[in-house]
């Protein structure tokens, strides 16, 4: 049987591995406690060591936590409006282009990219460069400093020009601040998107949890996008965010 004694070391290793992978401390602690609760008292097959069975239980628990089903993008509207949210530098603009390309090539949609970041220098130009590289039209109003108006006008433009999907790229900030949250809330309320996505840099580590929670409390987003997984990240942010906000990781 599995007992506290014969799996104590393995559980310690599991917790250390989670912390090394940037999983939030409390979540790592709760996770191992849950695995331990399920494991204690289980019969071990003669061919297995208690530690080996525990590894299987850890894998099962991770699968259950992350959700076995693939969550797609909601494209029900006409046009379908997708709102991007997240901190500055998380990769919203680049991902907006990747999503537009995916919807255009794989789903046969006519996509409009909308530049609503009126603060960051060259944000609008960046979206144009991205749009040009994938042959997707970009809507912007460089003189207009009201992102709500820009987004609303873009949707009107999309309706009258036969676009199926509108992807709204919004401004990020270096940290969560009230002004930024109020602005994206106003945009969200005005355009009523079918899909609100929270884009997070997977290398953010522990802090990703607090940011995700703040955005989710204000926008009740539909899914998470993890960027920069090709860096030196260990992906712990995925586990932490999924646990805290219980929203699917879509890409």
Which residues are covered by each model-predicted region?
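Primarily NTPase-proximal linker/entry elements flanking Walker-type ATP/GTP-binding cores
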Residues: 1-116, 123-144, 150-170
């Amino acid at each position: 049987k599995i007992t506290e004694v014969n799996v104590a070391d393995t559980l310690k290793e599991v917790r250390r591995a989670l912390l090394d992978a940037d999983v939030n401390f409390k979540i790592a602690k709760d996770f191992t406690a849950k695995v331990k609760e399920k494991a204690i008292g289980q019969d071990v097959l003669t061919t297995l060591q208690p530690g080996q069975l525990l590894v299987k239980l850890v894998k099962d628990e991770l699968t259950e936590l992350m959700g076995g089903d693939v969550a797609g993008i909601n494209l029900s509207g006409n046009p379908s409006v997708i709102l991007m949210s997240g901190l500055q530098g998380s990769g919203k603009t680049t991902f907006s282009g990747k999503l537009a390309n995916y919807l255009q090539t794989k789903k046969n949609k006519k996509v409009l990219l909308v530049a609503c970041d009126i603060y960051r220098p060259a944000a609008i130009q960046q979206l144009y460069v991205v749009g040009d590289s994938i042959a997707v039209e970009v809507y912007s109003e460089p003189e207009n400093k009201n992102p709500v108006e820009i987004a609303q006008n873009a949707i009107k433009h999309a309706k009258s020009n036969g676009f199926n999907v509108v992807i709204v790229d919004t401004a990020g900030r270096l940290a969560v601040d009230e002004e930024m949250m109020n602005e994206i809330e106003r945009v969200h309320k005005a355009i009523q998107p079918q899909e609100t996505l929270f884009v997070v840099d997977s290398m953010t580590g522990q802090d990703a949890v607090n940011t995700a929670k703040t955005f989710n409390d204000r926008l009740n987003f539909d899914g998470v996008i993890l960027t920069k997984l090709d860096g030196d990240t260990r992906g712990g942010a995925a586990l932490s965010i999924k646990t805290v906000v219980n929203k699917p990781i879509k890409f």
